[in-house]
Design a protein with these regions (language model features):
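N-terminal Rossmann-like NAD(P) cofactor-binding module of classical short-chain dehydrogenase/reductase
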Residues: 2-3, 126
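Rossmann-like NAD(P)(H) cofactor-binding subdomain of soluble oxidoreductases
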Residues: 3-80, 98
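Active-site nucleophile and cofactor-binding loops and adjacent substrate-binding regions
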Residues: 69, 182-183
Length: 183
């Protein structure tokens, strides 16, 4: 298993490195930590799909890429703070095998065969979390700061509901399962 924790700008570089090292050989299973979307031929492209496309273009045909999704910050993980993630692969057996391998008493893993749904959700969740985080400032301007401070959760709840709905639409658009958004 090779774990790829690179910036989204490094996808081309890592494809080149994998081709150099594994030219003519089987590439081990890959696990992408990198999140995001790219544009290819005027369409959104998941970074796992981009890496697969680049490797295929370079003649590597046997590629098995998994991805990690979920709220997990490196600093928390380094300090063994309880974290929960999902390992996704189009082959559920591979996803389970990797999830079992990585699971610890503080790094809790589940698994999914909805690679697209997990990747899209992971890539866009922070956009929606920022909107929810802005709820305090977005709630009614017709109330005092004191009342707003105590009652902004109605606005936050409405934003969470709308965010989930929009994530489901986007996930389905990129060929994932909308159920994956809710876990």
């Amino acid at each position: 298993l090779i774990v790829l924790g690179i910036s989204s700008k490094g996808i081309e570089w890592v494809a080149d490195q994998l081709v150099k090292v594994f030219s003519g050989k089987q590439i081990p299973n890959l696990l992408m930590l990198t999140k995001g979307l790219s544009i290819h031929k005027n369409n959104y492209e998941l970074l796992v799909d981009k890496l697969q496309r680049l490797l295929l273009e370079k003649g590597i045909t046997k590629i098995n890429i998994s991805a990690v999704g979920g709220p997990c910050l490196a600093a928390g993980l380094a300090n063994r703070v309880h974290s929960s993630v999902v390992i996704a692969n189009k082959d559920i057996k591979t996803a389970k095998k990797i999830a079992d391998m990585l699971n610890t008493n503080y790094y809790h893993t589940s698994f999914s065969d909805d690679l697209n749904g997990v990747e899209v959700s992971a890539a866009i969740k922070n956009i929606f979390s920022m909107a929810v985080g802005a709820a305090r400032g977005l709630c009614s301007k017709n109330i005092s700061d004191e009342v707003r401070e105590k009652n902004y959760l109605n606005t936050a709840s409405a934003l969470i509901k709308q965010s989930i709905h929009e994530m489901e639409i986007f996930v389905e658009h990129l060929k994932g399962k909308k159920e994956t958004v809710k876990g």
